[in-house]
A protein has these predicted regions:
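C-terminal subregions of glycosyltransferases and related glycan-biosynthesis enzymes
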Residues: 157-158, 185-186, 202, 211-327
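Flexible acidic/His/Gly-enriched loops in nucleotide-sugar-dependent glycosyltransferase catalytic domains
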Residues: 100-106, 112-174
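Short loop->beta transition adjacent to catalytic acidic/histidine clusters or analogous donor-positioning motifs
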Residues: 2-3, 24-35, 43, 56-60
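A conserved acidic beta->alpha catalytic loop
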Residues: 37-46, 66
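Short, well-formed alpha-helical segments that are part of the catalytic scaffolds
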Residues: 12-25
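Conserved nucleotide-sugar donor-binding catalytic segment
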Residues: 79, 142-227
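Glycine-rich, basic loop-to-helix element that forms the pyrophosphate-binding segment
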Residues: 64-81, 86, 102
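Acidic helix N-cap motif at the loop->helix transition within catalytic regions
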Residues: 17, 42-50, 72, 94, ...
Length: 327
């Protein structure tokens, strides 16, 4: 079984060497590393070139002549891989030595598994542990973990983004269902997880097999669980920034892609999965349509509360309060 790593890079000179070195420390080395660089203007490409001169496995570097953005840069790396299993990699983390071998064993032992993702330790920019994991900090509950173990990964992913790219590996022969990825900001991992969960099994590994580095540029996942005030401040910012167009576009594209896969006849997608995707799509559109008039909002929200969609596809009371007060 051939292992590929798909890495997206952009101005990563500060940390990329440590990430590359962590590939060398793997108990099971990759068979190739494919890096798509999105027009770095620092020394990133020089660091990669120096690393490649002594690296024991092949490295392919794609230098984009025009900036693609995060999503399409990852797609560029993924579609250029030739392995049977593709690991996604950021440019600023550190993989622990057993990461590749542990995830690869799952694919070897479970032919129906299409995607595997693991936990990660959160560290600061100097790699000092914060004592927290990504699953803790993103409120990935034991109930959700159990649902995935029971074959309900698609249900979880519709509501909660828990399959982060840096912790993920996918079976390459399923990439034709994933690509092309819609050109929406930073959705490569969410999209990949949703599509594969609709057509194949997903396996969780409750081990922190990499160090997720939190630093000034990358603050996607916080160091600690957020207080209610911090959550409120973030919700207010999201409401002001109006992030719903991206979410709505994601679910528009998800429904269209699943319909396409069904029509192609190549994959069996349960009717229940398709119905959930459609209902999630409708819920996203409803939430994106709110005006400032509280009476009009309530008239739209109450049916979504009664039918359970706020709890099935959003964050329950938190989302209700956000829509009622902040939007």
């Amino acid at each position: 079984m051939k292992i590929s790593i798909a890495m997206a890079s952009f101005n990563g000179e500060k940390f990329i060497k440590e990430q590359l070195d962590s590939f060398l420390s793997q108990t099971r080395l990759p068979d190739e590393l494919v890096i798509s660089d999105d027009g770095s203007t620092d020394s990133t490409l020089e660091i990669i070139k120096s690393f490649s001169q002594t690296c024991p496995f092949p490295i392919k570097v794609i230098s984009n002549t025009q900036r693609l953005g995060i999503t399409k840069n990852f797609e560029n790396a993924m579609k250029s891989c030739t392995g049977d299993i593709i690991f996604l990699s950021d440019q600023d983390d550190v993989w622990l030595p057993e990461k590749i071998s542990t995830l690869a064993d799952v694919f070897n032992n479970n032919p129906k598994t299409g995607l595997v993702h693991c936990n990660a330790e959160i560290v600061n920019e100097d790699l000092a542990s914060t004592g927290k994991t990504v699953w803790e900090s993103t409120w990935f509950s034991h109930k959700e973990q159990q649902k995935i173990k029971n074959g309900k990964a698609f249900d979880v992913y519709l509501r909660h983004t828990v399959a982060a790219g840096m912790s993920m590996a996918v079976r390459a022969d399923l990439l034709k269902t994933v690509l092309p990825i819609p050109d929406i900001f930073s959705i490569h991992d969410v999209w990949t997880a949703l599509i594969i969960a609709a057509i194949a099994d997903v396996t969780l590994i409750d081990q922190a097999l990499l160090q997720y580095r939190v630093h000034g540029v990358n603050q996607t996942i916080g160091i600690h669980r957020l207080s209610l005030k911090e959550q409120f401040d973030i919700a207010r910012k999201q409401a002001c920034d109006n992030t719903f167009p991206n979410l709505t576009a994601l679910h528009d594209n998800l429904v269209k892609r699943l319909e396409y896969l069904i029509k192609s006849g190549s994959y069996t997608i349960p009717v229940s999965v398709m119905n959930k995707a459609i209902k999630r799509h409708e819920h996203a559109h409803i939430r994106s349509s709110f005006s400032g008039n509280i009476i009009k909002k309530l008239a739209i929200m109450i049916p979504q509360i009664i039918n359970g969609n706020y709890f099935r596809f959003s964050y329950g009371i938190k989302s209700i309060v956000k829509d009622l007060i902040l939007r």
